[in-house]
C-alpha cells in the first residue's frame, strides 16, 4: 500500500467551475451574523439594524474594490443567474422604446442565452456571434454586428466550460466608441484574474459568491453610475439596492461574499501561481503518458484553473464512471445531466465524436500537488484500459476516418 495515499481524501474535488468549497475564513466571518448579529440591515431605528447595515456596506466596498468600482455601483442579488437576467432584461426593458438589438456570443452561459431567447419572443433582435476554433470571438465580426439599433453587447470574461478569456478591454473599447452598453458575466473570472471595470469600459458585470470560495445564494451586479446605466428591476418591493433589487438583504451571505472578495484581492497572485503550476504539471504529465489528448480552448488566453480535455476514442460518460474517485464534469454543471455534446465545443467546430469525449477538470485554491499526481495516474491508466476495449480507438489506429463510416441500422 502506498503510504502517500493514506493522506489523500477520496473522492478528489476537481469541479471548481461548478462550485468551490467555502474558505474557512469566510465561514468564520459569516457565523456571528447567523446568531448574535441577526439584525435587519434596513432597520434604521436600533443598533441591531445599524450593525447589520455596516457589515453589508463593508462587504459592498470589498466587492467593489476587487473590480475597481465605486461602492454605490454594487447591487446585491441571489447570484450570477439573477444578475445576468437583471442586466440583460433590465436594459432591454428600459431602453426598448429607443433601440431593439442585443449582441451576445454562442458560447455564453446558458442563463445569458436563455434570457436573450426570452427577449426574442418579445420582439428584441438578438445577434449570436460565432467563436473561432480557439473559443475566442473575432473583434471585426463584433464591430460589423453593431448597428444604430444596438443597445447592449454581452460577452463573458472566462468561459465556464473551456476557460478561455475573451479580450474584454478591446470589446469594451469598441462598445464605448459606438455608444453601446457593455455587459460581462464575470462569474468565472471575478477574484481569479485582474478585472477593472473602468479600464475595460464595462457598464454591467455579473458576480457569483460560490465561484470564489464564498456561500451559495449570493451574488452581485455591478451597474455603472457615470455615464449612468439604467435598468428596469425584475423584482419590485421595498426599493432596496437603489430600487433595482427589492427584498431584505441576507446579511450573513453578503458578509461571506465580501470576505471572499477581500481574500481574493489580497491572495490573487498567490492563487494564480498555485493554479498555473498545477495546470502545467497536470497537462504535461498527461501528454507524456497518453496520446491524442486535446486541450479545448486557447492554451495561453485562458484561466488555467479550467482544463477541458478531449480523449479521442472513448466516451466522456465512460471516463467519468471509470474515474469516479475524481469529481469532474462533462460540460457545465447546469447541463452536464444531458447526454448532448457540449454546445460550446460544437460552436468551436469540434466534431461530435471528440466533443463527446470532453471532460472538464477544475483546479483551485485547495487543490494539492498530490491530488493532481493521483488524478494523472488514475486518468492515464483508465484511458488506456478504455481504449483497449474501444472498437472506435482500434479503427482510428488503423487510419479509418470515423466520419465516413455509414453505420447500419438494426
From Swiss-Prot:
Record-linked InterPro entries: Aminotrans_V_dom, Aminotrans_V_PyrdxlP_BS, Cys_deSase_IscS, Cysteine_dSase, PyrdxlP-dep_Trfase, PyrdxlP-dep_Trfase_major, PyrdxlP-dep_Trfase_small
Modified residues (N6-(pyridoxal phosphate)lysine): 211
Top-rank lineage group of the source organism: Bacteria
Keyword entries, A-Z: 2Fe-2S, Cytoplasm, Iron, Iron-sulfur, Metal-binding, Pyridoxal phosphate, Transferase
Cofactor requirements of the protein: pyridoxal 5'-phosphate
GO process terms (BP): [2Fe-2S] cluster assembly
Record-listed E.C. numbers: 2.8.1.7
Binding site for [2Fe-2S] cluster: 334
Enzyme superclass (EC): transferase
Keyword Zinc: no
Location of the active site: 334
Coiled-coil features, chain-numbered ranges: none
Reactions listed under catalytic activity: (sulfur carrier)-H + L-cysteine = (sulfur carrier)-SH + L-alanine
Subcellular location: Cytoplasm
List of residues binding pyridoxal 5'-phosphate: 80-81, 160, 188, 208-210, 248
Keyword hit for Cytoplasm: yes
UniProt GO cellular component terms: L-cysteine desulfurase complex
This protein's pathway: Cofactor biosynthesis; iron-sulfur cluster biosynthesis
GO molecular function: 2 iron, 2 sulfur cluster binding; cysteine desulfurase activity; metal ion binding; pyridoxal phosphate binding
Family, as annotated: Belongs to the class-V pyridoxal-phosphate-dependent aminotransferase family. NifS/IscS subfamily.
Function: Master enzyme that delivers sulfur to a number of partners involved in Fe-S cluster assembly, tRNA modification or cofactor biosynthesis. Catalyzes the removal of elemental sulfur atoms from cysteine to produce alanine. Functions as a sulfur delivery protein for Fe-S cluster synthesis onto IscU, an Fe-S scaffold assembly protein, as well as other S acceptor proteins.
Assembly behavior: Homodimer. Forms a heterotetramer with IscU, interacts with other sulfur acceptors.
Name of this chain's protein: Cysteine desulfurase IscS
Organism: Rickettsia massiliae (strain Mtu5)
Amino acid at each position: 500500500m502506498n503510504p502517500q495515499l493514506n493522506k489523500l481524501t477520496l473522492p478528489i474535488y476537481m469541479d471548481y467551475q461548478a462550485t468551490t468549497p467555502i474558505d474557512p475564513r469566510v465561514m468564520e466571518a459569516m457565523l456571528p451574523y447567523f446568531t448574535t448579529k441577526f439584525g435587519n440591515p434596513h432597520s434604521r431605528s436600533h443598533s441591531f439594524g445599524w450593525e447589520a447595515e455596516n457589515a453589508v456596506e463593508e462587504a459592498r466596498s470589498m466587492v467593489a474594490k476587487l473590480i475597481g468600482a465605486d461602492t454605490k455601483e454594487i447591487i446585491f442579488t441571489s447570484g450570477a443567474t439573477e444578475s445576468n437576467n437583471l442586466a440583460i432584461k433590465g436594459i432591454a426593458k428600459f431602453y426598448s422604446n429607443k433601440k431593439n438589438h442585443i449582441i451576445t456570443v454562442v458560447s455564453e452561459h446558458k442563463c445569458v442565452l436563455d434570457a436573450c431567447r426570452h427577449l426574442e419572443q418579445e420582439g428584441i433582435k438578438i445577434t449570436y456571434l460565432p467563436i473561432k476554433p480557439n473559443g475566442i470571438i473575432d473583434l471585426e465580426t463584433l464591430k460589423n454586428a453593431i448597428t444604430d439599433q444596438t443597445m447592449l453587447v454581452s460577452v463573458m470574461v472566462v468561459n465556464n466550460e473551456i476557460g478561455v478569456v475573451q479580450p474584454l478591454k478591446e470589446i469594451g473599447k469598441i462598445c464605448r466608441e459606438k455608444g453601446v452598453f457593455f455587459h460581462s458575466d464575470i462569474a468565472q473570472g471575478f477574484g481569479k484574474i485582474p478585472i477593472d471595470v473602468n479600464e475595460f469600459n464595462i457598464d454591467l458585470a455579473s458576480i457569483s459568491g460560490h465561484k470564489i470560495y464564498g456561500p451559495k445564494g449570493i451574488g452581485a451586479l455591478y451597474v455603472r453610475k457615470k455615464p449612468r446605466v439604467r435598468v428596469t428591476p425584475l423584482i419590485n418591493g421595498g426599493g432596496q439596492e437603489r430600487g433595482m433589487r427589492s427584498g431584505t438583504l441576507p446579511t450573513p451571505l453578503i458578509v461571506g461574499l465580501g470576505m471572499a472578495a477581500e481574500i481574493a484581492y489580497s491572495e490573487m497572485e498567490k492563487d494564480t501561481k498555485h493554479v498555473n503550476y498545477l495546470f502545467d504539471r497536470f497537462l504535461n504529465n498527461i501528454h507524456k503518458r497518453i496520446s491524442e489528448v486535446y486541450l479545448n480552448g486557447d492554451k495561453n488566453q485562458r484561466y488555467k484553473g479550467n482544463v477541458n480535455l478531449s480523449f479521442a476514442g472513448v466516451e466522456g460518460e465512460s471516463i467519468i464512471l471509470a474515474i469516479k474517485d475524481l469529481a469532474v464534469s462533462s460540460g457545465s454543471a447546469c447541463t452536464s445531466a444531458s447526454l448532448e455534446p457540449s454546445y460550446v465545443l460544437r460552436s468551436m467546430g469540434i466534431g461530435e465524436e471528440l466533443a463527446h469525449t470532453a471532460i472538464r477538470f477544475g483546479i483551485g485554491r485547495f487543490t494539492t500537488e498530490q491530488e493532481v499526481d493521483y488524478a494523472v495516474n488514475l486518468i492515464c491508466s483508465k484511458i488506456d484500459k478504455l481504449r483497449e476495449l474501444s472498437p472506435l480507438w482500434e479503427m482510428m489506429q488503423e487510419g479509418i476516418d470515423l466520419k465516413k463510416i455509414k453505420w447500419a441500422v438494426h
